[in-house]
Amino acid sequence: MELTPREKDKLLIFTAALLAERRRARGLKLNYPEAVALITAAIMEGARDGRTVAELMHEGTTVLAREDVMDGVAEMIPEIQVEATFPDGTKLVTVHHPIV
């Protein structure tokens, strides 16, 4: 199977998000890479489902709460930008203050 660099990046994000989901389900607080991966994957999947950029900008702020992440992680992520594939093409989704 041949994958493009972009497809490899998507799989890496998905794998990291899956690990983050499992750790969160076990009651562990997420670190920086896990938090970013989980929010990014939610945005990418929402785009694939056909949601709008505006919907995903809002949804990105509801994926994690401060209680879900280690101390200081929320402050380390002032925004997340995701280049997501929508049914009508690729668009940039920016989520400001994703962890509140």
UniProtKB/Swiss-Prot annotation:
It comes from the Bacteria. It catalyses: urea + 2 H2O + H(+) = hydrogencarbonate + 2 NH4(+). It is found in: Cytoplasm. CDD domains: Urease_gamma. GO terms for biological process: urea catabolic process. One of its GO terms (molecular function) is nickel cation binding. It holds the Pfam family Urease_gamma. The keyword Cytoplasm applies. InterPro entries: Urease_gamma, Urease_gamma/gamma-beta_su, Urease_gamma_sf, Urease_subunit. Its EC number is 3.5.1.5. Pathway: Nitrogen metabolism; urea degradation; CO(2) and NH(3) from urea (urease route): step 1/1. The keyword Hydrolase applies. GO terms for cellular component: cytoplasm. Keywords: Cytoplasm, Hydrolase. Its main location: cytoplasm. PANTHER family: UREASE (PTHR33569:SF1). NCBIfam families: PRK13241.1 (NF009712), urease_gam (TIGR00193). Heterotrimer of UreA (gamma), UreB (beta) and UreC (alpha) subunits. Three heterotrimers associate to form the active enzyme. Belongs to the urease gamma subunit family. This is Urease subunit gamma.
